[in-house]
């Protein structure tokens, strides 16, 4: 199933900034109170637009993606979308176990249980911002990442 989900970042502050987004995605129990580590987070498929955003592959895991907006996000400005949809892998429906029970009268009851019953997916996006003044050093200090900042302000990851 595909879910239209449009995610972008708005700079509601008063200074221009560089921003990064950390997207965590995982499965939780039915009420969302406990993370389900027995379920595969890669079944949650996030469509990243790559429109002005670059992913830090070194920081990625099966549950986390880290993206950097490659331009300065000016005060009051909204970035291009970094996510435009989320879907669940259709193979999920194939993950089922069946048990059969034969009653005293000879009838057989077959019960199907899907592995992902009573689970929900969780997507959390956290935004961090860094000043544009001495950006390279500020980003290294705040985020621990080596970047290049070109004369026009464009950011790239080393």
Question: Language-model features: where?
Answer:
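Surface-exposed, hydrophilic segments of mature proteins
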Residues: 1-158
């Amino acid at each position: 199933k595909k879910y239209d989900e449009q995610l972008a970042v708005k700079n509601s502050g008063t200074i221009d900034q560089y921003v990064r987004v950390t997207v965590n995605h995982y499965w939780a129990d039915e009420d969302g109170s406990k993370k389900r580590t027995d379920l595969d987070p890669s079944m949650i498929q996030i469509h990243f637009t790559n429109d002005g955003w670059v992913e830090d592959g070194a920081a990625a895991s099966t549950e986390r993606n880290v993206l950097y907006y490659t331009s300065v996000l000016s005060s009051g400005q909204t970035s291009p979308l970094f996510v435009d949809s989320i879907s669940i892998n259709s193979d999920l429906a194939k993950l089922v176990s069946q048990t059969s029970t034969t009653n005293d009268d000879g009838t057989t009851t077959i019960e199907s249980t899907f592995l992902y019953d009573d689970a929900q997916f969780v997507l959390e996006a956290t935004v961090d911002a860094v000043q544009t003044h001495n950006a390279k050093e500020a980003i290294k200090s705040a985020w621990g990442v080596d970047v290049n900042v070109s004369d026009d302000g464009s950011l790239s990851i080393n």
